Amino acid sequence: MEMVNIKINNMPLSVPKGISILEATRMAGIEIPTLCYLKKINEIGACRICMVEVKGARSLVTACVYPVNEGMEIFTNTERVRKSRKMTLELILSTHDRKCLSCVRSGTCELQQLCKEFGVDDEGRFDGANPVHEYDDSAIHMIRDNGKCILCRRCVAACQAQHISVIGANARGFDTHIGSAFERPLDSVACVSCGQCIVNCPTGAIYEKDDTAKVLEAINDPEKFVVVHTAPSIRVTLGECFGMHIGTNVQGKMVAALRRLGFDKVFDTDFGADLTIVEEANEFLGRVQNGGVLPMITSCSPGWIKYCEHYYPDMLDHLSSCKSPQQMSGAIIKTWYAEKMGIDPKDIVVVGIMPCTAKKFETKRDDQAASGYPDVDYSLTTRELGRMIESAGIYFKHLPDEEFDNPLGDSTGAAVIFGATGGVMEAALRTAVEKLSGEELKSLDFTEVRGTDGI
């Protein structure tokens, strides 16, 4: 790899030729603020927050798209740079809905954080036209509020990366806004509910539809028996909501928090995952032995199912007919568990804590109520659960570790790997191979299906 010699804030540095100034400064331990940049996904220099000074250049340049070259001298924190960034933030705020106190992203908003860092107050020097912005709450899983949109286009890039492209930049000039084709509401376009636009939005312009109030209402209803079950990935992501290190396993504290929120039973979705493993393995064996449609594709992701329905309907016969662990858990709770406990299913409210907004859509599908009742009534994201715990005044870090309730709190290690790429297929293969061979596996690992080739 060819290297070039540059200086960043008078500090000499050798970096690969052709990388952006932003990448070079990060290699040097210097952070340049951005609002639109997503590496290899959205490198368009739209927000203009990352402007830096380059010796010999007539104007400031955008660090995220400007390549380094031999002898370049870069300055990231001059008075000219700071003034430019502050003015850009003021201009963004001039047309921004500044209802920060009631915004779901208050405290985690990237725009809010940068305004704080650069001393930009709520008043501002500029007064924008503040046009009427679209507010779209038609979808089951999310809300779009263009009043908080800063036109960074991260959501557009994320949607394109998923090969969906249901949102884009509409109109031109000052009237430019993010929307779907022909300004159609989200519930009438081919959105797969994956939520990647939500994850990548730097502000509160796109966010998950909050069902916490409905869940709390059910908890406070003495006639309702409210059961919650949590996906395997939640236990290693929830801690981030409370300032804990990324990936910290907080399973015990999560269970304790859910009990303190008032849930009657706290179960593990891994139990449903084990059921899914057995069902999918048997379905696969049935297809192999009876000349069924092959290859069989696992179907635990409702976003993947919706993607297939919209874009590849000819592949639907290849999908496993098994429900996802979320829905299997709900179905078991409202049938077998209800019968064992002597509870009328109509009085049971099942809540799933899931990592994906597509799970919200899944709970409302017509084919997910075979017992006459919805398998799962509400699906909450990690963020929603985090807000519930905070609003209840629960000091999460100081909670004791507690265990899931039996019997739907027990599971195998195969269920846990559902949270990893290829985990569903690998878990099903373990069962299928043992059934075909009649022997216990010597090795549980099927690394070929993990999708890590080339990584």
Give the location of each predicted region.
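Intrinsically disordered or highly flexible coil/loop and linker segments, enriched in small
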Residues: D97-R98, C109, V120, G124, ...
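Residue-level recognition of oxygen-bearing side chains
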Residues: S20, R154, Q196
